[in-house]
Each structure stands twice: as C-alpha cells, then as structure tokens.
A protein has these predicted regions:
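Phosphate-handling substructures
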Residues: 69-131, 186
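Active-site-proximal alpha-helix that buttresses catalytic centers in soluble enzyme cores
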Residues: 11-72
Length: 204
C-alpha cells in the first residue's frame, strides 16, 4: 500500500490578507508557525520513507519543521518544481477585488473560461493540474508502497486529489484545504481512498 501524507504549508501573511500568492513568497504568520508546531506533534509517531516538497520557502520551511523529530536533514528532502502553486503571473500579490476594479474584463474571462483561464503572464489551472499529474504518475510508478510526506500548497494538493479520484481537474474546487492541514490518501493497486481530509488544529 502507498500512503501519501499531504500537508499544506502554514498560514502566510498573504493568506491572512486574502492576496494571491502562487509562485512568489510570503512570510509565515505567528499563527502559521504555531499550527505547524502542532502538526509536527501529530506526525511524530509516523515513519517517512521519503519527503517531497515544493521549492517555495513556505513549503520547504514546513517540511523541515515536520522532519525535525524524524532526524531527516534538508539534504534528504526532495524539492520538486512540479509541486509549486499555480503561477498567477502579473496578478501575483493581488486579489479578486483588485482585479475586478482594475481589469474587469479579466474577471469576466476568468468566470467564463474557468479551469482553462490563463492568468496574464502566468498559467491556467489546467496547466498546473497537468504538471502536478505528470509528476504524480511518475511518483506512483516509482513507489508502489511506502509512507511519504508531501508538503505543498492548497492548489497543488487539490490537483493531486482530483487526479487520483477522476483523472482530471474537474473536482479541484470540491476540496477545502486549509493552511497547516493534513490530508491522507492511500493507494492499493492504483485505487485511491481519502482517509483524512483537511485535518487541522482546533478542528470542530
């Protein structure tokens, strides 16, 4: 059995303020730091056969913290370009309200084209999904069993879940993936089961 522990990085300032931060960087909030400490304790008893992360600083930092109890060094953590968040292009650091006020035509396009909408100078959800899916299938081919930690972004994790369940991006927005949350998926002979979804601190 292959078991994937999918962790979204801790809350960043951009998350808190509602800005789109895809492939750019944003520092962690105090709450984000605390929630990763909590998650580290939840995962202390796990054994990792490998650790993979997006190269974004927020994801790398999250993976490093979670690996401390397991004595896994930074050099042992594999940074994977395909696990990066969507590229918002020139809308990086902006939000829906800003785009609606300054480039309303783009909002109309966004709502009309949905997953095929390409952010100006960036990429579409379709493109992000395809790059994540390519890596995912290579990963599954290479590792038929084991327990793996994957630290990434909300969008990346939704791509993984949608691909595993139906083989495309259609279910992307059906999953809520909060900062510092844990989602666990098991695969047996290619059949994926979501065992835990969006598990986080102070969950009601």
């Amino acid at each position: 059995m292959l078991r994937l522990l999918l962790v979204r990085h801790g809350e960043t300032l951009a998350n808190q303020l509602g800005f789109w931060i895809g492939q750019g960087e944003s520092e962690m909030t105090p709450e984000g730091l605390k929630s990763i400490d909590w998650l580290k304790e939840q995962l202390r008893s796990e054994t990792f056969d490998g650790v993979f992360t997006s190269p974004s600083q927020r994801a790398v930092w999250t993976s490093l913290q979670l690996c401390v109890p397991h004595l896994i060094s930074k050099e042992e953590i594999q940074q994977i370009e395909a696990l990066r968040e969507i590229d918002f292009g020139r809308f990086e650091g902006k939000n829906f309200k800003w785009v609606k006020a300054h480039e309303p035509d783009e909002i109309e396009k966004m709502l009309r084209e949905r997953s095929k909408y390409v952010y100006p100078e960036g990429e579409s959800l379709c493109t992000q999904h395809q790059r994540v899916a390519r890596w995912l299938h290579e990963f599954i081919q290479k590792y038929e069993k084991g327990n793996f930690l994957i630290c990434a972004h909300g969008g990346t994790i939704r791509c993984i879940l949608s691909e595993l369940l139906i083989g495309n991006e259609t279910l992307h927005w059906r999953f809520k993936i909060d900062p510092a949350s844990l989602t666990i998926v098991t695969l047996t002979e290619g059949y994926a089961v979501i065992e835990t979804l969006n598990y986080k601190q102070n969950q009601v």
